[in-house]
Amino acid sequence: MPMYNFDFNRSVTNLNLSAARSGILTPAITSLELREEKLRRFNEVVQRVAPDRPAFKAEQIAGAARRVLRAAMKGQESTFIKVRMRRAGEIRAALGDAHWEVAAKTEPAMREIVAYLDESASALIDNDVPVVGLLDDAILVDAAMDGLRGELDDYADFCRYRIGEAARLGILPNEVKTRRECWFHERQQELRLELQLRRVRAANYGKSASTAPGFRIC
C-alpha cells in the first residue's frame, strides 16, 4: 500500500518527515496511508457517478492532500473541500426534500455519493484524519459535478421560489404546498412573459425609430 510522507520543503513525496528534521510543524499529520483496495473501491464509485472520468492514481490523491496541508500551514481553509462539501449538503437536501422529485438521470449518482460519504469505514481517507479527512469526499463530489450541476442549480432555484411563495402567503417555507412540476410551470410562464415583453419592446423601438422625423435641409 502506498504511504506518503509529506515534506513541504521538497516537491517529492517519498521523504521521511519529522518536525525536528524539517523544521516545519505540520498540522497534526505527517503521513497519509492510501490502501490499494480502498483506492480501487473509490475509483469504482467514481466510475459510477462520472463514467467519463479517468481513474485517480494514489499520487494524485497525495498531491491534492499536500496542497491542502500547505494551505492549512498558512492558516488557510481549503476552499476546494469547503465548496464541494457544501455541494454534498445540497445533494442530501434535494434527496430528502419531499416536495422535490430528483430527476431520474441524476438520482443514482446522487445516492451513490451520499452512500460513500456515509460509509466512513470503507472510505479512502478516514474522516478523522486531521485537515484532509474529507478530501476524498470532496474529490468524489467534484468528479460528479458536471453531471449534477444542472439538477442542483434547479433545486436551488426551487428553494428560492418556495421562500418567495412563503413570504407572499405569510407562512413558513416548509408549509408551502408546491412541487417540482409547479415550480417548473411557473418558471416557464415567467420565461414566456419575459420573451413577450422583449418582443414588444423591440417592436416599439423599431416603430419609433422608423417614424422619427428626420433633418430637413433648406
Residue locations for each model-derived region?
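Terminal, membrane-proximal amphipathic helices
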Residues: 1-109, 146-218
